[in-house]
Amino acid sequence: MTTSDGIKVVLSGENCRDWNGIHYREGMSRKNVGATKLSMNVATIPPGGVAFAHVHVDFELMLYILEGRVRHEYGDGLTEVVENKAGDFIFIGAGVPHEVFNMSETDPVVAVVARSDADEWQNIVPYEGRVQRHAADTSSRGE
């Protein structure tokens, strides 16, 4: 990281972190730039990867898909579905349960992730409330 009179820069190639099936390049947060309300990084979901069901407690999240196709199952019981591709923006409200699937078995999903929480990881909790589905409902996920 470099600093100059109020502007802080995180250089590409600096630290990485894996969490819940997703690879994150270090971005900006409270821990490295002193942000007080925001954090941002780049996330990669490997081919066929899943970020298992979780909830962002008390913060919102925005995604911009750079590469790939992604499916979110969300809401109570994870019964709602939305699919997105490169060029799409996605907003996830605070407290919305969701699970994320890379729809490709050969290509990664790469997205810019921005959060209204400077602490990044501390306010994310697992979600256990998936509604059981019928086989026909899960065939597109390879279950």
Put a short name on every predicted segment.
Residues 52-54, 72-73, 81, 92, ...:
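Short beta-strand His + acidic residue motifs that chelate non-heme Fe in jelly-roll/DSBH
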Residues 85-86, 94-121:
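Ligand-binding loop in jelly-roll beta-barrel domains
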Residues 32, 45, 84, 90-92:
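Hydrophobic beta-strand core residues of beta-sandwich domains
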Residues 32-33, 58, 77, 105-107:
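Short strand-connecting beta-turns/loops that link adjacent beta-strands
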Residues 26, 41-57:
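Conserved short histidine dyad/triad with adjacent acidic residue
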Residues 1-37, 52, 126-143:
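A short, N-terminal "cap"/entry segment at the start of jelly-roll beta-barrel domains
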Residues 50, 59-86:
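A short beta-strand-loop-beta hairpin characteristic of the jelly-roll/cupin
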Residues 42, 55, 74-76, 102, ...:
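Residue-level recognition of conserved beta-strand positions in structured domain cores
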